[in-house]
Amino acid sequence: LLADEFCGGFALTPDETAFVRREPLVTLADVTSFCEEVPGARGVNILRRAIRLAADGAASPLEALVRHWLHVPVEHGGYGTGQSAFNVAVDVGEGFGSGMPARRTRVIDICYPRQRCGVECDGLQHESSAQSDDDAHRQTQLSNVGYREERISWKQFSSYQRACEA
């Protein structure tokens, strides 16, 4: 999980109530290169295993958490869904969906391109009615080009996490 966060493009605000976009602290290529430079160093084998589970490009803490939860093998408490990518742009063409303004691309937070499916991680900003309308339109556009998208909100995820800890 830390590798996904270090390789992500976000940082928490000082009061930890929101996040802002920023350049990643490192990339997986940087970490892999480091492991090759110090092959016998303490902890390098653990780091190598961690980066096999990680991906570059998370845009929020929720994306990093959900992708990690989905990707980690079942025997380690995850769902073992296999490799996915963060924030994949999908061409939806023009004019698909309802009469709302068309966007040529939509970005899927956690995407499985070969399976043409993904997960949209809805933070608290997705609670407004305007955002709900855009989310519904987005889902229609993706469906029209053969992508299935599931959604998970921060409230759902934190509730599930609390239930699992009980």
Model-derived features with residue positions:
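Nuclease-adjacent, charged terminal/linker segments that flank catalytic cores
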Residues: 1-33
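Surface segments flanking catalytic/ligand-binding clefts of nucleic-acid enzymes
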Residues: 21-166
